[in-house]
Amino acid sequence: DIAVNTDDISIAGLNIKPFKTSHDCADGRGYVITGCDGVTKAAIATDTGYVTPELLSTITGCKLVYIESNHDVDMLRTGPYPFTLQKRILSNFGHLSNDACADAVCALVNKGTTHFVLAHLSKENNTPELAYKASTEALCSMGALENRDYILKVATPENESGIITV
């Protein structure tokens, strides 16, 4: 058995605070990392079926959020996965859809988050272009402009994300 540490830890001057995610695994966690300055924060929020109010509250105030944008719902529903797996992925304990991610990104931009990396994309049920489009269209519809109000990148397994300065 592996014990899950729910306490804050410090490594090289960074404070790392785990938080619970909504996923069908034992003790799924995301992380808020506070920089050496004690102010600048980043979050990693993947393997979550939906963004709970608690999760949103926890990552509010982060300058950078690395967030799951796992699947396009239409691709998932018409794709090769059996219905039982589709149902699990679409559940509150599955994975975050592009649209649900876009909703979270919009809420976070409204609260001051400026940098996003869309992550944990399904190879079978998503494309980087669809993930990017869902978030940027939602942000545009609320009047946010890319490179003014936010910077958004898509992480893929094939390419490194590069260094992001916040």
Language model segments and positions:
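A generic short-segment signal for beta-strand/edge and adjacent turn/coil regions
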Residues: D1-I2, G13, Y31-G38, F83-R88, ...
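Short, acidic/turn-prone active-site loops that include or flank metal/cofactor-
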Residues: I2-D8, N70-V73
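Core dinuclear metal-dependent hydrolase active-site scaffold
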Residues: V4-L64, E158-N159, I163-V166
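Cap/insert and terminal regions of metallo-dependent hydrolase folds
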Residues: P53-V154
